[in-house]
UniProtKB/Swiss-Prot annotation:
GO cellular component: cytosolic small ribosomal subunit
Organism in which the protein naturally occurs: Pinctada fucata
Recorded family membership: Belongs to the universal ribosomal protein uS2 family.
Transmembrane segments: none
Protein name as catalogued: Small ribosomal subunit protein uS2
Amino acid sequence: MSGGLDVLALKEEDITKFLACSTHLGATNVDFQMEQYVYKRKPDGVYIINLRRTWEKLLLAARAIAAIENPADVCVISARPYGQRAVLKFASATGATPIAGRFTPGTFTNQIQAAFREPRLLVVTDPRIDHQPVTEASYVNIPVIALCNTDSPLRYVDVAIPCNNKSVHSVGLMWWLLAREVLRLRGTISRDHPWEVMVDLYFYRDPEEAEKEEQTVVEKPAVKSDEVQDQWATTDIAIQPPQQEVSDWAAESIPVAPPGQPFMPPPAKDWSASTTEDWSAASGPAPQSALNGRWHLRNWG
């Protein structure tokens, strides 16, 4: 299909991506309809997929998707957890309608339910896992494009893209390549320049690993601040208090705490407390006449 045009030929960088993501590795079993896409069989029993046939079917699927006038009429589905992020990214890039997660039975056939849809094209990640939408698509004459492994059933599948649909990186790469080819056929991006969107954005990320990465990023600055505080605590810096110039020499001296000890203010004086003094010792005993006179005055009132 793409042998006559150099623009559509398989590039070396794309082959490198295929091999790095293990797209060429199939399963240990093979369906009789998938034998035409098998290149060889390894000694351990794993079938090797012909990547040239994979690329040709990928271009055919991209042409079918680009031929739909309204991008929202293309429905992309993935019930597998590691294909849901790729489906959502593909839908945001091309404008398709995503169904990530469980497919509600009757979405294509039951007109009463609120989630009823009438798409013109269906793209699924695995025809074995997504058998319900594939079966319903056959009832209402919707063409189906599927990412198929060597052991995938091809019943009701119109365009089968042979690849490894059980690998996290392989599924993300196939959706990324399909989105790139659709945008190139629509004229949104140029073939002369590489697509600025990275393949890593289409890969599945485990929520637990993502939380661990966020926690490590948050904990790193806190550890650094604790280390700085420990360094300042261990280093002994002798700080000499500044000498204050005293212009009034009659003033009291300013107490200065020695280095390494906290400063303690001088005790406050209690001006209300009166000092006890023995006035009788200085003045002597009172005269007897005064005491007698005071006695008589008290008696006579």
